[in-house]
Structure formats: C-alpha cells, structure tokens
C-alpha cells in the first residue's frame, strides 16, 4: 500500500527542513513528500531537493494547502503532518499503513503525539478554578458536554486523546491520514473560505469528523511524534483568537449535526445558548477582576456573536471573489 506525505508550512524554515530529513530516514519512506509552502519567501533548500515536491502558495490557509497538496499526490494513502514535528519512532509509517490493512472500512488513521502548546500562556488564569464544582456547574449550564476521550460532541467539544488503540471520532491536526479518494469530499470550499478570511479554527476536527461519513477512524495510541511548544501561527491577539475560535464552533456544530444525524436546529440553538453564557461569564469576570486580557476576550465573544448572525459560513458570502475550483486546477 503506497502513501504520500503532505506538509502545509508557513514561516518555519528550520522546522520543516529538519522534519523532512527525519521523514526520509524512516523505513518505509513515502513515495512522495509534498510540501505546500505559504511562507513569505521560498525555501530554496526544499525547492532544490529532488526528494521533495515543493509547491509555493500565496495563500496562508491550512485547509487550502492540504487540498492543494492532494492534487499532486499519487498514492492511495495521504498522510498530513504539521511542519514543526519531531519523529520519535521511525516505524511510524509501517504502523499507519498496517492499520489500514486491518479493516477495509478504515478510511483514516492517526498515531500518538506528545503534544505541547503555547496558546494557553497568552490567557490569564480563570477567576474560578476549572476543576472546581462551580466551574463544572457553569460548564454544564452553558451546554458544554462531558466528552469521553477520543469522542466529539456538540459545539466541536472533544474529550482529549484516547490512550489505547481504537476507533475515534476525530483526529488532532499534527497527524492525520486518509484514503486519497475521500480527501476532496472532506475539505469543502466553505472551509477554505472560512480560513481565507482568518475566521477559521478547528479545521482538523471539521475534516476528520467529515471522514466518518465514509468509514472508520482509527487511532494508534503509541507515541510516534513530538509537537514542541512553538509559537502558534493561529495566535495574533486575544481578540482575534477568541473571535475565530468561537465563530468556528458554529461551523463545527453544523458538521457535527450532519455527520452524527443530529437536529441542525437544536445544534444551532445550543451554539447560541453557549455563546450567550460565555458572554455573561466573561462580563462578570471583567467586572470582578478587570484586565485588558479579559476585556479583549469579551470583545472577541461579542464579535463572534455578531459574525454568526450577519455572516453566513459559505464560500459565496465569505469569499465571493475567489473561485476555488479554478484556483486549484491552475
């Protein structure tokens, strides 16, 4: 079973150079390593590397880069990676490919990742401890479900990584693999437009749970990758991060309703109840303990609410000037 690796990257030259070298040392190695680079300048090392299919893109848009990379792929299995990973077990590819062979209904496979993120350090601690009884009551009041590991629920809420091998509802973005014949069906143009407007978050969840319409997703719990605590390309400010992450939960709610046969009306209703409660909680927090960070968080929530009412999440409304079909075929 042949496989290609696709890596969207943006302004992480040292990381992507190191990671591609690590991939080439694995056995088996991919048929092709496809790097879709939206950096400010071209990566001459990768451009001149005969082992790399190097595509320079003008769009800093991760789902677009994923879909563009698939157009250059030839193998049956496509493995998507983030650009800032380290491989800690060189048998990663044999594990992924052998998992597909276990069951013909498996359409997606991932592996364990030692994941660290720097985003949380940009926010202040909550006034109420997240583990307190009051916090749990507030979560339940706002409609945040208690989700089991490996599962996803309304609002795109996930239950954390599954620590045993097994079927899951979603993948984490640093490592996702799918059968090639479904990729164009699970990365819709609406998602590209959402990210083009810098209003998208959680594209890994949207893509992977959409794949469940076509078969099973399987996660290998063994750690094969390490994701260091690098600066996120998604974090520009508290305001923009909260706005895009909250607005995107409406998109994830629609995908969740479609894939899991839930009432779209009820899922949208749950979204607006959630955002109303979050605005209320953020307002109280700001009054009790004022800070510029809490102020920006509240502004982001209000902006997301406004967008959810006024801006439909489809390509015609988000990016009427872009024809994705023509762009991807050129």
Residue ranges and their predicted role:
Residues 240-248, 259-330:
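Non-catalytic, C-terminal membrane-associated alpha-helical segments of glycosyltransferases
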Residues 11-25:
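Short, well-formed alpha-helical segments that are part of the catalytic scaffolds
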Residues 22, 35-45, 85-86:
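A conserved acidic beta->alpha catalytic loop
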Residues 171-173, 194-207:
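Acidic donor-binding loop at a coil-to-helix junction in glycosyltransferase catalytic cores
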Residues 57-73:
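Glycine-rich, basic loop-to-helix element that forms the pyrophosphate-binding segment
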Residues 189-201, 216-238, 249-252:
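Active-site donor/metal-binding and catalytic loop motifs
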Residues 91-141:
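Conserved donor NDP-sugar-binding/catalytic core segment of glycosyltransferases
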Residues 78:
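Short aromatic/hydrophobic "clamp" motif used to bind/position activated sugar donors
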């Amino acid at each position: 079973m042949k496989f290609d690796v696709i890596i969207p990257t943006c302004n992480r030259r040292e990381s992507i150079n190191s990671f591609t070298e690590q991939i080439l040392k694995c056995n088996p190695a991919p048929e092709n390593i496809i790097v879709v680079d939206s950096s400010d300048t071209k990566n001459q090392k990768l451009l001149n590397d005969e082992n790399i299919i190097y595509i320079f893109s003008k769009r800093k848009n991760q789902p677009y880069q994923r879909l563009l990379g698939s157009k250059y792929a030839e193998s049956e299995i496509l493995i998507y990676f983030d650009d800032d990973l380290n491989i800690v077990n060189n048998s990663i590819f044999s594990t992924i490919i052998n998992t597909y062979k276990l069951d013909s209904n498996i359409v997606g496979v991932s592996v364990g990742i030692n994941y660290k993120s720097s985003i949380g350090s940009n926010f202040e601690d909550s006034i109420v401890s997240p583990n307190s009884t009051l916090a749990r009551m507030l979560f339940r009041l706002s409609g945040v479900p208690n989700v089991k590991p490996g599962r996803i629920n309304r609002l795109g809420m996930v239950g954390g990584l599954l620590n045993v091998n097994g079927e899951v509802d979603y993948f984490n973005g640093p490592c996702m693999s799918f059968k090639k014949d479904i990729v164009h069906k699970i990365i819709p143009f609406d998602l590209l437009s959402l990210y083009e407007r810098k209003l998208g978050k959680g594209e890994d969840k949207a893509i992977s749970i959409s794949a469940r319409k076509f078969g099973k997703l399987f996660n290998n719990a063994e750690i094969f990758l390490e994701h260091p605590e690098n600066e996120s390309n998604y974090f520009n400010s508290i305001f923009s991060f909260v706005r895009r992450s909250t607005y995107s939960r409406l998109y994830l709610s629609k995908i969740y309703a479609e894939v899991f046969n839930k009432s779209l009306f009820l899922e949208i209703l749950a979204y607006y109840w959630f955002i109303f409660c979050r605005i209320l909680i953020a307002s109280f927090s700001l009054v009790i303990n004022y800070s510029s960070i809490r102020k920006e968080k509240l502004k982001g929530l209000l902006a997301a609410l406004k967008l959810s009412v006024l801006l439909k999440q489809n390509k015609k409304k988000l990016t009427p000037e872009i024809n994705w079909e023509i762009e991807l075929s050129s």
